[in-house]
Amino acid sequence: MVELGFIHGRFQLFHNDHLRYALLAKAQCKKLIVGITSPENATLIREEIDPHRSEAASNPFTYYERFNMVKLALLEAGIPREDFEITPYPIERPEILYNYVPLTATSFFTIYDDWG
């Protein structure tokens, strides 16, 4: 088990597969950091692979709403509040990501989305 784990996603809506991803990662670490990508909907960058992903209709929730969805889902799943953190994760700006997640965190990934 690692000390610090990390996952990230848009979580435009935090659904059951996202929760499963978070719980599987949490089982591998003492503390989990959850990064919410595209924290500022106004700065969404058009994605060539799926242009709809950057449209306002595909991003109905604010960072604050997504933060609360993630927090409440993890608490409801039985994860103590002191065992996870939630942070913005502006993935479109890789040069500043170290400001949001420690470089010592182990990143956990999954691939299961409809966009490719």
Q: Predicted regions span which residues?
A:
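Nucleotidyltransferase catalytic core that binds NTPs
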Residues: 1-116
